[in-house]
Amino acid sequence: MLMLSLTATAQQKREFRGAWIQCVNGQFQGLTTQKMQETLIYQLDELKKDGVNAIIFQVRPECDALYPSNLEPWSRFLTGQQGRAPQPYWDPLQWMIDQCHARGMELHAWINPYRAKTKGTTTLSVNHVVVKHPERCFEYDGLTILNPGIAENCDYICEVARDIVTRYDVDGIHMDDYFYPYPVAGVPIPDEALYRQLGGNFSTIGDWRRNNVNVFIRQFYETVHQAKPWVKVGISPFGIYRNKRSSDIGSDTNGLQNYDDLYADVLLWVNNGWLDYCVPQIYWEIGNKAADYDTLIRWWAQYASGRPLYIGEDIERTVKAADPQQPQQHQQQAKHRLYEQLPAVKGTVLWYAKAVVDNPGNYAAMLRQLYWRMPALQPEMKFISKNAPSKPRKLKPVRVGSDYVLFWTAPKVKKWDEEATEYAVYRFNKGEKVNIDDASHLIAITRDTFLQLPYATGKQHYTYVVTSLNRLHSESKIAKKKVKL
C-alpha cells in the first residue's frame, strides 16, 4: 500500500514540519548532561530523516528555565530540583539551537506563560516568582497560576520573552494552550475580588478575563518583534474555538471551548495579527462524536487562515483509530488527504517528538518514505517583511580530491531581511526547463555556502540552481550553473 501511494502524493515546496519536544513528561529529569544530549541527538537525527524541519522545545514549563537565567530558576524537569544548575554545566537552549541549525531545522523556544507550579512540584527555589510575589498568583486544582488580571504579571512574562529573544538566536517563540486554567466542575477561579476591583468596564467576568489575555498577547507579540522582528510568535491553542451552540460561527462540536472556558479569543489574535502562526491542537480522530477531526480542520482552515495555519497532530491517537474509508488502516493517510484538500493548512506539528521516533503504526516511516521524503522550505511570512535577499554570487564547481563540490558566495547585505541565512539548491536534467516552483527539483536546504555533488562519469549534464533565503524564508532570484557529473 505504501509503494502504491508514492506517486499519488504531491510534495509541497513550502511546509512547516514541526515536532514538540516537551520536558514535563520527565523524559530528561535527572539525566546526566551526556545522557540527555545523547537522547536529544538521537531524536533529532531520526526526526531529520523523517523530514521534520522545525523543533518546538519546551524551555519554561513553570516559571523556570532550561537555560541560564537571571529572572527564573533552573527547572526541576532538567536537574530534579528547582534552582539546581546542571552538572556538568551546560545550556540546553543554546545547545539545541546549535544542534537544530546544524541539521537545517528551526528552533522555537516554547514557554508556558501563566503556569507557575505544576502538581508534582513540592519545593520552589527562593528566587521563584511564586516565592517572591505570592500576591500575584492564585491556586487552582493543584496548580499555581500567575493571575492574568494583574498587569505586573503581563510585564514579567514579556520580560522573560525579551530576555530569551535578545540572548538567543531562536527562530520562534511559542506558547501552548494554557492561559486561564482548564476548568474543574464546581471549582471557581478565585479572582472575583480582583474583578470587582479592576473589571468595572466589563459586563461579565468572562469578558474581563478574555481582555486580560488579549492585552497580554498583544504586548507579548510587540515585545518579541521590537527585540528581533524576524523571530516568529506562535501559539498552539486548544482545538475548539467555540461550539455551534455557543456561537453562529462555532464548529459543529461539543467540547471545551477556548473562548468560553479558557478565555482565549484565538480568532481575535489571528485577525489582529498578534501572532505569526497558529497551531490548533486537533488531537482527536476523524469521526470523534464530540470533536470530529474532519469538522475541526475544515473549521480552522475557514476561519483562522489570516496567519499561517499549522495543525497540531497527536500521532498516538491517530494510529489507534481506524480510517473510516479503509478500516484496515489507521488514520494517517486519511488526515493527510485532508491537508491536501485544504490549501489554508500550511503545515503540521507532531505531538510529540519521542512518539514520532518510536514509530507507532509506521507513522514515521510513512513520513520518511512518502509524505516528507523531499525537503521543504518554511512558509513565507511577507506580512513581517516583503524583502528578499539577493541571489548567491560566484557559483563555481570545483574538484576537491575525489569529490566534486559546488561553491558560492553569500550576497551582500544592508538590512536583516537581506541576509542569506540558508540556501535552497535545485537540480535539473539536461533539457529540462528551470522551474523552482516544482518541489521535486529541490534537493537540499543548507546553511553552508557549498554542496558536495554526486560525481559519476563526468558525462551527465545538469543545471544546478541556488537561491538565497532570509530569516523569514523569502527566496531570492536564481543563480545557476551547468555541471557535468
Predicted feature locations:
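Solvent-exposed loop/turn segments flanking beta-strands in beta-repeat/beta-sandwich domains
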Residues: P411-D438, H461, I478
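Active-site-adjacent "subsite" loops/lids of carbohydrate-active enzymes
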Residues: R14, W20-Q22, G26-Q34, E38, ...
